[in-house]
Structures are given as structure tokens and as C-alpha cells.
Amino acid sequence: MSPALLFCILIAYFALLLGVAWATSRNANNDSFFIGNKSSNWMLVAFGMVGTTLSGATFISVPGAVGIDAFGYGQVLIGYVFGYIAVVYLLLPLYYRLKLTSIYTYLDGRLGRRAYQSGAGFFILSRLFGATARLYLVVAVLQGIILDSLGVPFWLTTFVILGMILLYTYQGGVKTIVWTDTLQTTCMLGGLFACVYFMLGQLDLSIPQALQQMHERGLSRVFTFDPDSPNFWLKQIVAGAFIVLTMTGMDQEMMQKTISVKTLKDSQKNLLALTAVLVVVLSSFLFLGGLLYLYAPVAGVTATGDKIFSTVVMGHLPAAVQIIFLIALISALFPSADGAITALTSTFCIDILGIQRRQDMTEEAKGRLRRHVHLGFALLFLVMVLFFKWVDNPSMIGVILKLASYTYGPLLGLFAFGMMTTRSLNDRLVPVVTIGAPILCALLEYNQHYLLGNYRLGLELLMVNGALVFIGLYAISRRATIKPAVVTA
């Protein structure tokens, strides 16, 4: 299909997004931007969060990783279920009881200002790396299938896409994103199931026959039983639970949408519904990956990893499937980037600049400052995407989860210490602990050959990081003379 036609489809899709944004952002204010005026429909939030949770990294990398790890990602998926249950029944009641706009305000009331700012700072770092890595992956695919042939440079593609995101989130924030993410999730899931349907047709297989062939070729293996392997089943399941606990339950972007729902009960239904949908969708992505690796030898495709999906679709499937793939790919791109920029803006304004505590600023001045911060993060996203272009790792899902182990570990330690103890901290030393723990983890990972023998660290590095922060916080704490105002839910 002509790159020019595909480009026109891209523009038409964005025009639709702008229409939705215009309709939902009228009469928006700062509360609309930060928490959607606390009036978001839980079903819309749950459905839209599927797109945010999955992102372009899932769309491209999870099917691509089947060639290396088979269905091993299913171990992490099992852990996700336990993690969501923990968020629903441990963290959400706490956030609603305290009526939080930023979830890191909890750390301020319980542990102190430095702990509060450390938590917000690590969230900013986490989302900045994670969201830009996801954005890079999808931009790179779009560049390869459309824009290289039109002579458009990579940096300009990224700049224009970020400009598009700014246009439809600049005013409405969360109030707009709840609706645009719903539209984009619909397109992404439609693309996923359409690709599965067409791949089965190309291979002339039913679902049971396809699974049988995957089994014969070793593509359907889920569990790894070698305890020294980074993919050992118990490590992966436990790590999956902690990934959700931190990357959803302690993540302002994900919780910002969740706590925009009016009541705790509806918010809990939102996350439980999200969990059920994610199990089906991620299993479908693994199945699609198996189909791609069954089809590749037949079609003479040599691409692997993150490149196999786009190579098969754009080079070997009908034009209709190519259009569906493009729309689904764009739909996977925007939710992970728009929500991240909005959440980073919220966290920086509320937690770092203290915009809601500023009595000396008018509502208009606060809105102007918030828009400047929003623009600043968009420019920072551009720089980070160009950095990942320079790195050019062949499997970005691994990079994203590895980065999460380092940046979400301090959040895990801070929240765990606040909820599991009643001790008070030496607030000045908190940054030393939260920065020191990831450095120790990096040294441990680099020297694991000498320190751990045949054992290889995997995603459990997140738990090690969190445990080091917890131990460090305990070391700089003392028994509280009065009961803390905020401890647990």
C-alpha cells in the first residue's frame, strides 16, 4: 500500500481524536486536568486503561518476544492478577480515604516532605524513561513503514506526534484522556483480533490446530523450572505481582485515572474489570506472536523480535489488514504517551511546585503555569525518544521492565515502610536511601557472576531494590513518640 495513503489515514485518525478532545474539554479547569472533576465513568476508565497499560511496547514487543521466550510472558501475566487484587484491596481504600489528587501526598503526611518529593521524583523518572521508550518503539515502526519513504526524518516524526498529543491534552487533561483512550483502546483491540483472524486464514489453521503446531515447535511453553534462570516461574509470578503493585498502584498516571471515578466501589470495579480484560488481551498477543513465528518460515520472513509483526503485516498481508494494523499501532502509541505527559505535569505541579498549596496564585496563573510545565515535558519527551533511537535496543519490552526495576523500587520501599510500620524518619536522609538503593542494585547486577554464582537476576531486581530501600529507611528511623496521622487504609 502507498505510504502516502497510509499517511492520509494517520491524519484522518488524528482529526477524529481532536474532535473528541474538543467535545470533552469545553469548560475544563485545573480539576478537570488533574482528576477529571472526580466524575469519570468507571467503565470508560477501565476500558481506556487497557490501552494505557498495554501501550505500543506490548503491541510490538510481546508478540516478537515469543520467538525467544515462547509463552514465558504468561508467568508474568499470572503475577499481574495477584498484583491488581492487592492494588484494589490495599491501596485504593487508602487513596479514597485520604481524598488524594496526587497519590504521593500520602508520603508527605506519613513520612515527611523529603519522602514525598523523593516518591514524586522517582515517579517522574520512571514515567519519563518508560513512556518515552514505548513512544520510541512505535515511532520507529511508523518511520519504517511510512515516513522513511516520504523522506521525513525521525526527529520530525517524533516532534509532530508530540505536537498532536499536546493539542488534544493541553486543556482537558484527564477529562479528555478518559474518552480519547476509550476510542484508542477500541481501535487497538480491533486491530489485534483482526490480525489474529487474518493470520489464521493465511495459515489455514483453526485455533486448536495453531496451538498444536506451536506446541510442536516449542513456542507455547509457559513455565521455566530452572531456579537459576532469570525466567524461573516463581520469580516471574512474584515479580509480575510487584510490577503491577508499583507500576499501577504506586503510579500517578494509572491512579490519576482510577481515582477520577466518583466512588471507591466503582473504582475497585474499574480495576477488577481491567484485570479480566488484560488476561484475555495479553494471552491473545502471545497467541498472535506464535502465529507470526509459524508464518515467518513459510513466507521467507527473516525478521525477529520487535520487527517481525510489522514486517509480516506490511509485506505479506492484504491492504485492509495493513490499514487495520496502522490504526491499531497509532492507537497503541497515543494512550501511553498522552497519559504520561498529563500525569507528569500533574505530579510536577502538585508535588514538586506545590501548585495547590499556593494561596498567592490565582486560578488563571495556576493554569498558565500548568500549561508551561505540560509543554516542557513534551520537549523532554522529544529528547528522550531521540536518546532511545541512539540506543536502538532490539527488544524494548525488556528494556522497559529493566528500567522499572530501578525506578519503581524506591516507590515500593517508601509505600511499604509507610503502610507496614509506625516509625518516623530522619527526613533529611531519605534521598540518600532512595538514591543509594538503585546504585547498590546496579552494582549487584553488574557483579552477579561473582556474587551469585549461576543464579541470574531477572525482574525480581524490583523487589530487591524495594527491600533495600525499606531496610535503609528502617535504619534512619526511630520509634514514633506519637501515632502517625496516616498509616494504612
What are the functions of these language-model segments?
Residues 1-489:
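Membrane-embedded helix-loop-helix hairpins and adjacent transmembrane boundary segments
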